[in-house]
Amino acid sequence: MTLKTALTREDILDLAAYEKIREQRRGEIVAAKKLRRVAVGPYATFYFESFDTMWYQVQEMLRIEKGGEAQLTDELEAYNPLIPKGKELVATVMFEIDNPDIRTAFLAGLGGVEDRMMIKINGEQVIAKSEQDVDRTNAAGKASSVQFVHFNFSTD
């Protein structure tokens, strides 16, 4: 089996076909995401992405927004970078704090966090590289509550 590292137009179902399988696929994706979720501390959760999780995200965005082919191009451009390419893990990192005052204060002190994440597996320490689509820390030093990071492992 070949590892799929990018979504194409051919992978995406039209809205009518997607509606027929949506509930089944949703259940499968929810179950898979539970196994790909790692809580780190009281507020941070890493959601490790895959071809399937990004396929589902694109399908759901198209379903909700109904933007047609123009939207599909944008969604593929936005989500393809989050599909792992070989020897890497890609994570969506979410800082989840219900209280807006605590969340604002917490994120204000977290600027640059996207450059300080790492993962250690079998003694190998891999520093995260943030997705470069937009700055995830603003000029005032406040971090975004959602970060996208890549962990690129060596070929050894």
Residue ranges and their predicted role:
Residues F48-V90:
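A glycine-rich, hydrophobic loop/mini-helix early in the fold
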Residues A16-K20, R26-G27, R63-G68, V90, ...:
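N-terminal start-of-chain detector that recognizes signal peptides
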Residues M1-A31, L35-R37:
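Short, extreme N-terminal leader segments that mark the start of a protein/domain
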Residues K34-R37, K66, A70, M118:
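Residue-level signal for secondary-structure boundary elements
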Residues Y79-D156:
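Long, charge-patterned amphipathic alpha-helical coiled-coil/hairpin "stalk" segments used as oligomerization
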Residues T8, A44, F148:
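Short, flexible active-site loop motifs that bind/organize anionic cofactors or intermediates
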Residues R22-F48, W55, M61-R63:
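Long, hydrophobic N-terminal alpha-helical segment
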Residues L3-R9, A16-A17, S50-V58, A78-P81, ...:
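A broad, low-specificity signal for short, low-complexity segments enriched in glycine/proline
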